[in-house]
């Protein structure tokens, strides 16, 4: 069961990371398009600014699961190095519970925002509702839950590699 969960978690986390990378590429392409239309053609495309903002929102919330999976979000590396094996597991459990609590708030509030955003339209793209921007929060949160639990079952200690 644990092996199956970790396999599913790996696939979903990888998919969310690929999606986050695609959103970053989209934001960069739209930014270039906006510069060309505004400064070269002198005909600004207002919708690009909104789409850049939304693609960056999606990039962040879909990239968070990988950060949780790599152990880079909530790190207690100093305590982890000083603690014995038993205390390390207690620390891992506390970090997991705290992370899941935070993500639960993001999921609940994000879902509420999404439902409220159904009646709002996106400025510059009036045919679309704000639901599509806000749904990134609960969706990224759900993927993050899998990453958090996956890191608990199969810890990855990359805090020193990801530190500046």
Model-derived regions, located:
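Alpha-helical transmembrane segments and membrane-interface helix-loop junctions
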Residues: 1-164
